[in-house]
UniProtKB/Swiss-Prot annotation:
It comes from Geobacter sulfurreducens (strain ATCC 51573 / DSM 12127 / PCA). The lineage of its organism: Bacteria, Pseudomonadati, Thermodesulfobacteriota, Desulfuromonadia, Geobacterales. InterPro entries: SurE, SurE-like_Pase/nucleotidase, SurE-like_sf. This is 5'-nucleotidase SurE. The keyword Signal does not apply. GO terms for molecular function: 3'-nucleotidase activity; 5'-nucleotidase activity; exopolyphosphatase activity; metal ion binding; nucleotide binding. The gene is surE. Its main location: cytoplasm. Binds 1 divalent metal cation per subunit. It is an enzyme of class 3 (hydrolase).
Amino acid sequence: MNILVTNDDGVHAPGIVALAEALRLVGTVTVVAPDRERSAVGHALTLHHPLRVTEIMAGIFAVDGTPTDCVNLGIHTLLAEAPDIVVSGVNRGGNLGDDITYSGTVSAALEATLMGIPAIAVSLATNGHGSNYRAAAAFAAQLAREVLDRGLPRDTFLNVNVPDLPAEELGGPVITSQGKRDYGGDIVTKVDPRGRNYYWIGGNEPVFRDIEGTDFHAVKRGRISVTPLHLDLTNYASLSILQSWDLSACRPEAGQPSGALL
């Protein structure tokens, strides 16, 4: 089995080192990961400058791009054959609830799924530097075996969040839905020595709703959350509502200004 491993914390991050080691018991591992921290880049793809790749040792490649770039390069260029599975992680910090929309870790798995390859995103739900990557990686390797044996539903990948606990203290895995985070004004304003304002985004601790059956609910109780995510983002329940709207007045008229600002 050929396994492509990537992340958004960078090729030298402890999570990806532990993950690659665990997955070598499952198949042949190739690591293609960003050459530096790329957290919260979402599904960004580099289009306006060339990408550089460095093979830092046999089967381990560092890319000066995003996790999505890494998956593309791995599948289409760096691997001799397409991988049987892509595993992204182990991320430092959880990817829970609405936060998955920002996650480079999750987006790497999404990109693989777009290409028809089974994929798993794995995160260690820690507020610090994390110390139990091996436990998370061991679970990811076992889950990868299951996915390789059973397959996944079409256009579906798995988002896994593992509490930052020793293996013997972890609760069993549970299948969950995506949770919900409440967003506030998480902007920290500072003043530089020249009197100009600068800003940090995300300065406050995230607040998740503790809803039974969700990823956050499981992780908070020491259990491993496994959430199936789907490529189709359509809100089918809203289709009939929107179809009842009269949108005829929204058609642009000839001669209207372009709306250019400059």
